[in-house]
Amino acid sequence: HLEQVFTDHGVTYTRTGVTEKNLKPDFILPGIVHYHDATFPQARLTMLASKSTCKDRWRQILNEAERIPNKHLLTLEPSISENQTCEMQAERVQLVLPRRLHSTYTPEQQTWLMDVAAFIDLVRQRQLA
């Protein structure tokens, strides 16, 4: 599904490209070749992990792409606890959710959540820079 969304919006990406320690993040945008190119600006790189549910598994993404300090995590899990989302923020993990799930989070959490459209806009801006 995500790959189709990326294609529909003209977003380039690599699925499960290999990074440090032979790790394979779900998506590197614009691509793994750019990730490994030391001259490519770090600010234009994006990593997106995709997990249908998070629980404590979200921490697995923290070391998947060392060049990208701010990670994005797409999930379909409603109402993750405030403790968990505070930990995510502290670890620089931005939660991305379909807009319809935002209402399952507290008003304070909702101010920080990103929807899929905003993620696509961010990535497109980075790819056009």
What are these regions (language model features)?
Residues 7-129:
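Catalytic core segments in nucleotide and nucleic-acid processing enzymes
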